[in-house]
């Protein structure tokens, strides 16, 4: 597959009360990750009869150890914001002056004293 790139699309599913991260990989000859669809019934984001959902790329991160990572937001098949798309809701609330991100905390302890 010379000339192909692999992208790992990452999104939040529709499970309640807490969403989980989902991902799937696409091989394509596109220089940038294209929009992609998925079956939302398996992620609690659609009913079985009309289960198409769209993954819209928001940000791509190069990964020297494998697939480029594509952070996405979920839209319904008609390109409207999906109810599980919290990013769109947050984006509507803030201006360019705000920063939104994740924080991870670490605690260092002395193994002798605990």
Pin down the residues of each PLM region:
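ATP/Mg2+-dependent ligation/transfer catalytic cores
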Residues: 1-114
């Amino acid at each position: 597959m010379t000339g192909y790139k692999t992208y790992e699309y990452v999104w939040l599913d529709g499970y309640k009360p807490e969403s989980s991260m989902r991902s799937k990989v696409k091989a394509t000859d596109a220089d940038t990750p294209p929009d992609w669809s998925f079956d939302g019934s398996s992620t609690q984001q659609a009913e079985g009869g009309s289960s198409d959902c769209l993954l819209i790329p928001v940000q791509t991160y190069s990964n020297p150890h494998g697939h480029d990572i594509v952070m996405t937001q979920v839209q319904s098949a008609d390109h409207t914001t999906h109810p599980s798309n919290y990013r769109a809701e947050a984006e509507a609330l803030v201006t360019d002056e705000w920063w939104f991100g994740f924080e991870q905390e670490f605690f260092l302890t002395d193994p002798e004293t605990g």
